[in-house]
Amino acid sequence: MNISQNPSPNFTYFSDENFINPFMDNNDFSNLMFFDIDEGGNNGLIEEEISSPTSIVSSETFTGESGGSGSATTLSKKESTNRGSKESDQTKETGHRVAFRTRSKIDVMDDGFKWRKYGKKSVKNNINKRNYYKCSSEGCSVKKRVERDGDDAAYVITTYEGVHNHESLSNVYYNEMVLSYDHDNWNQHSLLRS
């Protein structure tokens, strides 16, 4: 994809070179790539340098419990048991993982989906706890982790695992609003007034 042909100036395409190892320690975010979002709405990719903070995005396909698909390279993992039985050659379903690093005063930001908190745990080398969420839509197995950056508490790291099998609530609301639009009497609709 040629960036100059990109119709959306806020979208950034990343190639396969930015994929990360899904089996790395969950506490090691130093190798992740994050998308940096300022409170003022200034979005952008910041090159990874020693003198600047890491603020890059990463998207990958990995083997895991959550369902979904991605357009990235699939990593396979063979499971084995140590109970004296034969090794299992089962390959788990593939999923998709994306991490965002956002400058924010609040921990959990509205991303258009409904989430149910199912856990919280202390993270090594970080005074802030990591929160775990599952998508509350029936049949959707997407999970997200939310935690404050250990180096700079002004940033929140949100990691999504999986792909939603449904539309976000904001898309449903927007589609209903557009469907109720009357081309002849657009001033009469309270949803479309500013």
UniProtKB/Swiss-Prot annotation:
This protein's superkingdom?
A: Eukaryota
- Region spans: Disordered: 58-97
Keyword field contains Nucleotidyltransferase? no
Summarize the record's disruption phenotype note: No visible phenotype under normal growth conditions.
* Predominant place of localization: nucleus
Question: What's in the GO CC field?
Answer: nucleus
Mind listing the GO biological process terms from this record?
A: defense response to bacterium; defense response to fungus; jasmonic acid mediated signaling pathway
Kindly give the InterPro entries that the UniProt entry links to this protein: WRKY_dom, WRKY_dom_sf, WRKY_plant
Cell compartments where the protein resides: Nucleus
Give the signal peptide range. none
Amino-acid biosynthesis recorded as keyword: no
Positions of the DNA-binding region: 104-169
- Stretches with biased composition (Basic and acidic residues): 76-96
Question: Which UniProt keywords are given for this protein, alphabetically ordered?
Answer: DNA-binding, Nucleus, Plant defense, Transcription, Transcription regulation
Any Pfam family: WRKY
Q: Which family does it belong to?
A: Belongs to the WRKY group II-c family.
Assembly information from the UniProt record: Interacts with CAMBP25/VQ15.
Q: What is the official name of this protein in its record?
A: Probable WRKY transcription factor 51
Q: Which organism is it from?
A: Arabidopsis thaliana (Mouse-ear cress)
Q: Which gene encodes it?
A: WRKY51
